[in-house]
UniProtKB/Swiss-Prot annotation:
Keywords: Chromosome, DNA-binding, Nucleosome core, Nucleus. It comes from Blepharisma japonicum. GO terms for molecular function: DNA binding; protein heterodimerization activity; structural constituent of chromatin. This is Histone H4. One of its GO terms (cellular component) is nucleus. Belongs to the histone H4 family. Residues 1-14 have a biased composition (Gly residues).
């Protein structure tokens, strides 16, 4: 039953560091999140 817990968190440091003073852009990004994007984010967080 040996198994290592694999959490993928490699290049997550730079995410969201660029847009600091643009709330409208962030809002558009939230609205623009589609299923593939959600899948990608989930995969990054270690969710299948």
């Amino acid at each position: 039953m040996g198994g290592k817990g694999g959490k993928g968190g490699k290049g997550l440091g730079k995410v969201g560091a660029k847009k600091r003073h643009s709330r409208r852009v962030i809002r558009e990004n939230i609205q623009g999140i589609t299923k593939p994007a959600i899948r990608r984010l989930a995969r990054r967080g270690g969710v299948k």
